Amino acid sequence: MEVSERPIGQGPRVTVEAVGRKCPIPIIMLAARLHEVPIGAVIAVTADDPAASADIPAWCRMKMHEFVAEHPLDRGSAFHIRRMY
């Protein structure tokens, strides 16, 4: 599992690379890394499993975090999530 960090104010603070992993693995990886960003910061998950487009926003609603956006990539998408608590 790769994680990259960025300074505050320059997009997601952490990106979790889940390309090539099938759901629910991207969500499990997100949940395991979410505590690494401060409350109010954005974490990104890159994934290419088509189920991630529905599963990640649903997980955000269930866990009461903010689903910010889905950005298409050459392979899959980047899902941005704001940590709310």
Region roles according to the model:
Residues V16-H71:
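Amphipathic, hydrophobic secondary-structure cores in small proteins
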Residues R13-T15, A78:
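A residue-level signal for beta-strand positions that form part of recognition/binding surfaces
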Residues M1-G11:
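Short, compositionally biased "basic patch" segments
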Residues E5-R6, P57-Y85:
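C-terminal structural segments of small proteins and small subunits
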